[in-house]
Amino acid sequence: MLLRFTKMHGLGNDFMVLDLVSQHAHIQPKHAKQWGDRHTGVGFDQLLIVEAPNNPEVDFRYRIFNADGSEVEQCGNGARCFARFVLDKRLTAKKRIRVETKSGIIVLDVQNDGQVSVDMGPPRFIPAEIPFVADAQALNYPLEVDGQLHSIAAVSMGNPHAVLRVDDVQTAPVHELGPKIENHPRFPQRVNAGFIQVIDRHRANLRVWERGAGETQACGTGACAAAVAAISQGWMDSPVSLDLPGGRLHIEWAGPGKPVMMTGPAVRVYEGQVRL
């Protein structure tokens, strides 16, 4: 059978989006891996699936697969594309959309200028909830990699993140250190690794090595986690503008227990069909 899909991106973080509200199919990890190949498939960082909700209090269910076939809990850039997609496809007429994910409910607001704001919910710092192996909760933790200690912040934005402060993101060892942090035994579900360079109280540069995808042009949850870590440690103040390789995201966070608000673009690239 043929399935209709839309290729989208948020700051270069690219997605294949499938509507399984008006189409019916059983998507398995092998499909994500097959379609995610940039040489022989569609090619993407993540596959986003729009489904009818299980919960009557939300509008849609949102599922995410990485290009390696692993299903993950959350994707911030994908959430913005999800909101733009369901409006463009007339699956809803609402500008404020409640969505069920593996890690909870998020709220998407589509603005008149085309930008999308996402209420990502409050960050979580308790090690067991990230999950991260630590004796006690702290603002930062020493993490040993290849005999060297690195100071990291550990945060969950519905998915696990490690955040490291660096002097210059251009020269940071993202491709060497990123996969080693991703697969570090202290992160039992693996982790996304963010490398942040603070410019001033409200601006920073960021690169993210994503769990199951490698370095991407932008990572929405990674930007949220980096902003939360920087504000928590006193390096920065809300609101924060983060420049990633693919462009800029705006993050607001009022402190512990408060939701993280992320605003950025969502772009449709093309429509296509793929054989299941």
Curated annotation (Swiss-Prot):
The subunit field of the Swiss-Prot or TrEMBL record says: Homodimer.
Q: Which UniProt keywords apply?
A: Amino-acid biosynthesis, Cytoplasm, Isomerase, Lysine biosynthesis
What organism is listed for this UniProt entry? Answer: Pseudomonas putida (strain ATCC 47054 / DSM 6125 / CFBP 8728 / NCIMB 11950 / KT2440)
Q: Which GO terms describe its molecular function?
A: diaminopimelate epimerase activity
Gene name tied to this protein: dapF
Q: Where does substrate bind?
A: N13, Q46, N66, G76, N77, N159, N192, E210, R211, G220, T221
State what this protein does: Catalyzes the stereoinversion of LL-2,6-diaminopimelate (L,L-DAP) to meso-diaminopimelate (meso-DAP), a precursor of L-lysine and an essential component of the bacterial peptidoglycan.
Primary localization: cytoplasm
Taxonomically, what lineage is the organism? Answer: Bacteria, Pseudomonadati, Pseudomonadota, Gammaproteobacteria, Pseudomonadales
Q: Which NCBIfam families match?
A: DapF
**Transmembrane region(s):** none
Residues of the active site are C75, C219
Enzyme kind, highest EC tier:
isomerase
Q: GO terms for CC? A: cytosol
Which pathway or pathways does this protein act in? Amino-acid biosynthesis; L-lysine biosynthesis via DAP pathway; DL-2,6-diaminopimelate from LL-2,6-diaminopimelate: step 1/1
Stated name of the protein: Diaminopimelate epimerase
